[in-house]
Amino acid sequence: SSAASDVYKRQAIDSTLAAKIKAKKSTQYEYLVSELKEEKALNYDRLLMLNTFNFDIDNDEYIYPSGTSQANTNIDVYVVDTNPEVYVGDFITPYHESDGAYYGNTKGVFMKLLALPPHGLYMDLSCDITISSGTGSFQVEYQKMVGGVPSVGSVNGSHTSGLKAGSVYHYNEKGLVLVDPTKNESGKIGMVYRIYLNTEAGVRIKIENFKMSVYYMAKMQPERIDVIKPDVLLNRLLKSMNEENEGYVGEIEYQDDTRLSSTVIMAAESARGLDGAKIYTSFKNFSDWMEVVYGYVPDIAENKVVFKKRTSLFHSEVQKRISYTGMDFKVKVNSSLIYSLLRVGYDKQDYDSINGRDEFHFTNEYDTGITITDKALELISPLRADPYGIEFLVSKRGKDTTDNESDNDAFFVGAHLKENAECYELVREGYKVSGIISSSTIFNAMFSPRSIIEANKEYIGSFVKSLRFASSSGNSDIRINDVAENLDIELTDPLFTVSTLSISTADGGIPSDVNALVEVERNSLLYTCFINELKYKIGHYEGVDYNLQIKSIG
């Protein structure tokens, strides 16, 4: 959870609403999504996923068949499929000698093409080959019967004539094109693929370090998911904290962050498509999420909670000027505001899929360069934003398994509802993402860990001046709009400093705006400060005790 919300608070006047929030902020409530959802659902149009068939060699030594007088022959390389990770199927299938004829009875056949993957089909293949005498070649070939006539071709780049006795031939090709998405290759549907070696007579061949995979990108069918607007959830939480009575109002100043006006919340159970889906959350979770992701904090007054940009609570005009000559003048560094480490982002999730390695909505750590403490400032969102997490949940629709790890989680996504549209659509416009497999379909780029620092930069800049990227629990090779997610960051515009000033003054006049600046003049220095706390006794004229957070000294 966010430590920031506990770090620096102006002392709010304790209204009944403030007292209720204080008492019940951590209580977790559950609500039926059907009671809070938007009239129109999100059209979740899926992530492109990598699908991989891996093949291994069945036998690593091949001997030229004896008793033949041919000058050379084709020797089949037997391969078998192992550990496929197939997310969207029905394009290719492993296929072996017993599955049908290929040159009568060929053992080197390993797969058949059933349909054309829309983004192409590719192969990576590497191995080391030694031959006992003479020379030879190594080849991947495809064939199908068309009207009783075999149509045969060779995979470009897979043919090598470099085998010769006395040396190891290192074969290594990546991205061999089996189906080119830029061409009409419908004639390849039904092809079977085979690997063989062509050698002279009487040889022994050894193949080692064999690695082969065939892969393609594809996505599943779009699904509709119910979503909830942040202010609707906020008002439902206020009603729960008020014993199910109306009377309290929650508002969000959407206009100060364009990302927020296109944010919707999604329950994990909604992503799963479960009947009677519920969302589980608390006011603290909601508040921490708003603070971490958008830099918004709750402003509580009377019977209203307004979430607004933290910076808007620090007013720039000077409300009061004090010329101070008294003795009770204490400036000290508030050590609770000093950190050696900044953690930002989201809790790490474990996926059992190679695709999940691309996810970058996890935790980034930055070194502040401060060595006098080992404290960390954590800005970790309690709501999740990981696209792969949503994709894996949606892919479980129709399956009865429970995913205890994440069924109670809540997600949020950037989505907008265009005029007259029947669904919310994911926002991808304006965000160019690289360093990721599914760059064209990834979403939530606007909520990367780096964006959290941007949303809170004046606040974080009050404690540290520069952040050196240390590590990421996710994919740190990501670039968003050509900015690397793992760049160091300089912070130049702090809200305040880590020093406080305490004074007691006989001047009993209270500033009318407690969020405005107070200037204190002493010994020809001018201390410009925000009010942390002020104490005065109503009806007893004993002056005012100020606890001030210094913004600048000049």
Report residues per predicted region:
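Proprotein-processing/basic-patch segments
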Residues: 199-221
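Noncatalytic modules at the cell exterior or secretory-pathway interfaces
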Residues: 176-199
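An acidic/polar, Gly/Ser/Thr-rich interaction patch typically located in mid-to-C-terminal regions
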Residues: 98-101, 253-320, 327-554
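Charged- and aromatic-enriched interaction segments used to assemble
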Residues: 9-52, 56, 215-321
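Short, small-residue-biased leader/transition segments that mark boundaries at the very start
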Residues: 2-8
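Extracellular carbohydrate recognition and processing domains
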Residues: 152-181
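Terminal (often C-terminal
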Residues: 47-144, 203-209
